[in-house]
């Protein structure tokens, strides 16, 4: 007589995919030898009666290094702007993640997808627009950090990524320095003499400002040129310019007092820019002219 049975698999386990064929049939033949004995033999021969093949796998996980490794951007010399600086994470020289800072200096890197357990060693650095490390008045920080990521199989079909800075450093910090290049301004005037020809160095003129005093003379063409002033900080600088009264008989000296106001601004790209405005009393003038 032949007996046929159906064997099924049931149950679930995290991360395990059961055999798509959930049922197996197996038959046994029972034989009577007419001598009081029964024998049983599986229909189909020797070997395993049946096999269920299940598959264990893990789901990929996305993880950003900066979720666990605090990365901070600092800028001295001016305010930091959101998205101003870029940071790269490299593995074997290839960029695998990048990101920027926010206005507070916090850096967020893009996530990396991990599909299997393992260990990854990364280099974290700031990206610089050129090899000099200097761009638009900003000196970039060339510091690099090593990040070691360990991806573990939790045994339930999931992966966990753990990111740690190598060494004793608790966080990755990058400090850039902003400094605008100085600018120079030339302040000059014109001397006009009526009644006779003007002579070189005939008249003297004084410029006075905060911690500044300079006296020069005219050239033969009437030009008056003070030394150039250099500025390394933004601000407003005010000077008064007047003619020094001489004692030549028959000469009427100009008693006018002019004001030169120099406004120095930082363009935010590493440059100081200056503009000069002239005034006589409370009236704006195009330039300074002394008439004798």
Predicted regions and their residues:
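Solvent-exposed loop/turn and edge beta-strand elements of beta-rich ligand-binding domains
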Residues: 1-292
């Amino acid at each position: 007589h032949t007996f046929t049975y159906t064997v099924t698999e049931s149950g679930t386990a995290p991360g395990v995919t059961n055999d798509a064929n959930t049922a197996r049939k197996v038959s046994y033949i029972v034989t009577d030898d007419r001598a009081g004995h029964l024998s049983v033999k599986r229909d189909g021969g020797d070997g395993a009666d049946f096999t269920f093949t299940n598959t264990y796998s893990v789901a990929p996980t996305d993880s950003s290094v900066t979720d666990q490794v605090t990365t901070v951007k600092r800028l001295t010399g001016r305010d930091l702007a959101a998205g101003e600086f870029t940071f790269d994470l490299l593995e074997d020289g290839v960029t695998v993640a990048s990101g920027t800072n926010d206005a507070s200096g916090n850096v967020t890197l893009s996530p990396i997808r991990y599909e299997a357990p393992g260990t990854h060693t990364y280099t974290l650095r700031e990206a610089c627009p050129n090899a000099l490390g200097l761009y638009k008045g900003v000196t970039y920080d060339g510091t690099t950090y090593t990040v070691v990521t360990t991806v573990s199989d939790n045994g339930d079909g999931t992966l966990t990524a753990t990111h740690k800075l190598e060494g004793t450093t608790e966080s990755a910090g990058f400090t850039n320095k902003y400094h605008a290049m100085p600018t120079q301004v030339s302040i000059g005037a014109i001397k006009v003499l009526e009644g006779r020809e003007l002579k070189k160095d005939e008249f003297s003129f004084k410029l006075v400002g905060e911690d500044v005093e300079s006296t020069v003379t005219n050239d033969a063409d009437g030009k008056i040129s003070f030394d150039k002033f250099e500025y390394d900080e933004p601000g407003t600088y005010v000077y008064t310019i007047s003619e020094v009264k001489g004692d030549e008989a028959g000469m009427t000296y100009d008693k006018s007092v002019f004001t030169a106001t120099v406004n120095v601004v930082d363009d935010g790209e590493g440059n100081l820019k200056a503009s000069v405005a002239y005034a006589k009393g409370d009236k704006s003038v195009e330039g300074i002219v002394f008439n004798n």
